From Swiss-Prot:
Subunit structure: The complex is composed of two ATP-binding proteins (CysA), two transmembrane proteins (CysT and CysW) and a solute-binding protein (CysP).
Cross-referenced Gene3D superfamilies: MetI-like
High-level lineage: Bacteria, Bacillati, Cyanobacteriota, Cyanophyceae, Synechococcales
GO cellular component: plasma membrane
Keyword Cell inner membrane: yes
Entry's localization field: Cell inner membrane
Organism: Synechocystis sp. (strain ATCC 27184 / PCC 6803 / Kazusa)
Pfam families the UniProt entry points to: BPD_transp_1
Name under which the protein is recorded: Sulfate transport system permease protein CysT
Gene: cysT
Record-linked InterPro entries: CysT_permease, MetI-like, MetI-like_sf, Sulph_transpt2
SUPFAM superfamilies the UniProt entry points to: MetI-like
Gene Ontology molecular function terms on file: ABC-type sulfate transporter activity
CDD domains assigned: TM_PBP2
Amino acid sequence: MTTNLPFSSPSKQLNRFSFWQSISIPWVVTIIYLLLILVLPIAALLVKSASLGLEGFWQIATTPIAISTYNVTFITALAAGLVNGVMGTLVAWVLVRCQFPGKKIVDAMVDLPFALPTSVAGLVLATLYSQTGWVGRFFAPFGIQIAFSRLGVFVAMVFISLPFIVRTLQPVLQELEEEAEEAAWSLGATEFQTFWRVIFPPLIPPILTGIALGFSRAVGEYGSVVLIASNIPFKDLIAPVLVFERLEQYDYPAATVIGAVLLSVSLILLLIINLLQQWGRRYAND
């Protein structure tokens, strides 16, 4: 009696051998590094939150104070992203198309939120926008309180997310051919028509990408917001600060669940950003 053994073609064996032969030390180091720095912390958070069960997770994630912090965090971050979508586009346009004294200094200042420690940024913003600060004193007579309110949270999120839209747009603006604009003008188009029909369409993907990047950065902001906000529940308390407060109270399950919610939102945003970038590349190729 004969037994037919499974046959593996030489080409498949060669492909497997070639794969293992192609693995190099940099590849191994990269995988280990990413596992330790990115994958394991995320996996630990997800496993910890999953251990509570669906019902326990839902009860903690939907408490009134948690829902209030989601509202403050996500809506304020979205508002900051939309404002920077407009003003960041204007800043990028000026830096690319206009020549003026001190342009390099202004361009370098755009990256200040990247370099400045967030706690220092929060301290500076709270000092400027308090009712006795250089800026806040002009709004105080009208009953407008910026620092230690939700408006202060908005200002901090605008500050830390501005570079994302500017730096995303600048390369696209630099690659736009001015000949297309000149052709539109020669055909009788106004400046507004030229901008709306020739310049603006290629800018839509990077603008949306910049807004998404700024939004995701603002959602996770802690250092600058905690100093300019009053951090009062149901007023201007944001989700990252609530996570820290729960850790201070040794309420690790609540901190884990709220952190998992923020992580889920961040992963969804990363997916959206990747889709927007692919759309932008296809649009540029077309």
